[in-house]
């Protein structure tokens, strides 16, 4: 196709795509493709009219009850969560019973967030396996144990394997009978159908699967409890920083802690010339012995319900679940529980608390009365909302696609108990298209969420603060904790930086708005 404009790029002049697609020849090309290939292109005025209507109260009343379609949900699929959970155990190779394309997606999703490669294999199911079952794929696939030399293989499933009803337990036993792997080699499994639930359900299923494998084969559940405390982080995009912070805090208290699924090393390997297919992770022996711990703490109640129920039946008598404890109060509650269990309060932690309170006092005038929309996983939304209220801010719209009716009531109770947040409302089983209606009809100052919120930011012109998984378009946030007093300080700084950037952007026109373009904030 000919163009009326000369081509802007040549071998001697390579233009970055940011600039290239703004050149006249590309503008002309895009316009022509729209005219030729879009069936009956809608007039610009009609597009503008409908767009304006979708921002109204009338449209919101039609949009919020919609359940038959989901547009931009705040969740991913079960296998992603299961894969993350599996990679938190020593020398573990996730084995996805399904197609290669699916496992490529799961690996890519995690890699784009953590900026680290992650190892997983597939049983490479194709059309014949979909008809006759995937037993032979499982038998052949588990033989990769000899090539990759893991200490454990954790099996999860895709939609294909679940639709045809493959029996993982039976398949694994058959594979062991065929000597694909030694009979005593650990191969825990979890059924993780991607067409129901979410990544947090998949995480829960895999944690339960691993514990069932080790604890279900323990010889003596009546062994006296030891002084160890188990901790389950839950699905957490900041797991690298948060798990290390939890271990640091445990060290300050002198607590012997077993983190059940510790991905902090596996997703933060150094570039030192040594390739590590498996790095760090919870030792398998410690996982087996965790059944004898004095207590188990879950950092995310809504991310670990089945695991907690299993622990109630089989494991440590003491159980405590939190909702992504952030901020002063959230950290207070966690550390008081640790002090109670260990009998060892730490002065160092008290000093950290005082520094956080001082920082909040220094900056509270910039936070007081600011209105926020928060979306993400159920526990994150709860923890984040509580911290915002501590800062004097107002969480207005709290939304989670994975949120249940129970979660809605819990969030609403928290909001109603705070005068500054009493106008806030929780929305479970809703998506970002619903949130779009909410923020257009009931304005907020900032949105807290993940990278998918950037399209909402562009549409609504409301600044986005990225504080939860996945963060694809920013680098290395996951290395910094959001839990503990130090983590709360990191979150506070992240929020304040966005507020100050917004102030500068709105006061930088010389002679018009720069009267408040201040050097000191």
Curated annotation (Swiss-Prot):
Gene3D superfamilies: Nitrogenase molybdenum iron protein domain, Nitrogenase Molybdenum-iron Protein, subunit B, domain 4. [8Fe-7S] cluster binds at residues 77, 102, 159. It comes from Azospirillum brasilense. It is an enzyme of class 1 (oxidoreductase). GO terms for molecular function: ATP binding; iron-sulfur cluster binding; metal ion binding; nitrogenase activity. PROSITE patterns: NITROGENASE_1_1 (PS00699), NITROGENASE_1_2 (PS00090). Belongs to the NifD/NifK/NifE/NifN family. Ala-194 is present instead of the usual Ser that would serve as a ligand for the 8Fe-7S cluster in the oxidized state. The gene is nifK. CDD domains: Nitrogenase_MoFe_beta (cd01974). This molybdenum-iron protein is part of the nitrogenase complex that catalyzes the key enzymatic reactions in nitrogen fixation. It holds the Pfam family DUF3364. It catalyses: N2 + 8 reduced [2Fe-2S]-[ferredoxin] + 16 ATP + 16 H2O = H2 + 8 oxidized [2Fe-2S]-[ferredoxin] + 2 NH4(+) + 16 ADP + 16 phosphate + 6 H(+). NCBIfam families: nifK. GO terms for biological process: nitrogen fixation. This is Nitrogenase molybdenum-iron protein beta chain. Binds 1 [8Fe-7S] cluster per heterodimer. Transmembrane segments: none annotated. Its EC number is 1.18.6.1. One of its GO terms (cellular component) is molybdenum-iron nitrogenase complex. The keyword Lipoprotein does not apply. Its cofactor is [8Fe-7S] cluster. It comes from the Bacteria. Tetramer of two alpha and two beta chains. Forms complex with the iron protein (nitrogenase component 2). Keywords: ATP-binding, Iron, Iron-sulfur, Metal-binding, Nitrogen fixation, Nucleotide-binding, Oxidoreductase.
